[in-house]
A protein has these predicted regions:
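Gly/Ala-rich beta-loop-alpha elbow adjacent to hydrolase catalytic centers
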Residues: 110-115, 119
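The feature captures the conserved acid-bearing segment of alpha/beta-hydrolase catalytic domains
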Residues: 139-189
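N-terminal cap/lid segment of alpha/beta-hydrolase-fold proteins
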Residues: 1-16
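A conserved amphipathic alpha-helix that caps or lines the catalytic cleft of carbohydrate-
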Residues: 40-41, 123, 187
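A general structural motif
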Residues: 20-22, 47, 104-106, 129, ...
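Conserved hydrolase catalytic core segment
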Residues: 121-131
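Serine-hydrolase catalytic machinery in alpha/beta-hydrolase-like enzymes
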Residues: 12, 20-99
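Short beta-strand immediately N-terminal to the catalytic nucleophile in serine-hydrolase-like folds
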Residues: 106-111, 135
Length: 189
């Protein structure tokens, strides 16, 4: 495991231990990279390297554009995803992959909640990832469904994983109520 700081973000590289293993980039809310890497190993996943990025300003770094707060007493979203993606693809990725043995067979991006939204958004703004996982992605984000339907990914991904909880849309918040409907619609394209 190696850790470095880039653009104010803490980056932890968990090498697979075998050459040319796939690599997954995971934007984390806290610092759960080690737990995720250990869980992947314990459940018998094929070897892969994990690059966990933490120290994020969640409502800025993961949001594709400005948007007023959708939760009571919450901060607004300040649309820094393009900047975050430039940092990830331009600085973090090359430095992290110098720590790996060989060349990754494929490169994926994954995230939970707003980071799941960011993972999908990255496919539309960059061609560096061939796979993505949006785990309980914030696909309720205003305008995102329309964005996906009016734009094409920079490259056709090999695989995309979506998940949404059974009760995520069962909320009084009218914006968040759209999460399941939006996830199903986006998954269908």
């Amino acid at each position: 495991m190696r850790t470095f700081v880039s653009g104010g973000k803490t980056v932890t590289v968990f090498p697979a231990g075998v050459p040319d293993a796939p690599v997954v980039y995971l934007n984390t809310f806290g610092d759960e990279g080690q737990k995720v890497f250990d869980a992947l190993a314990s459940c018998g996943c094929p070897p892969l390297s994990l690059v966990a990025v933490s120290g994020l300003d969640w409502n800025h770094d993961m949001a594709p554009w400005d948007c007023p707060a959708v939760f009571k007493n919450a901060e607004s979203f300040t649309g820094g995803a393009d900047e975050s993606l430039r940092l990830l693809a331009g600085e973090i990725l090359p430095r992290a992959e110098r720590e790996l043995a060989g060349t990754p067979r494929w490169r994926g991006i994954a995230g939970y909640s707003l980071a799941g939204l960011f993972a999908l958004y990255a496919l539309y703004k960059s061609d560096v990832f061939s796979r993505a996982a949006s785990v309980s992605g914030s696909l309720w984000f205003p305008g995102f469904r329309e964005y996906v339907f009016s734009h094409a990914p920079k490259r056709r991904p090999d695989r995309v994983y979506f998940s949404v909880g059974d009760r995520e849309s069962k909320t009084k918040n009218p914006v968040r109520q759209t999460v399941q409907e939006n996830t199903v619609a986006i998954c269908g394209i």
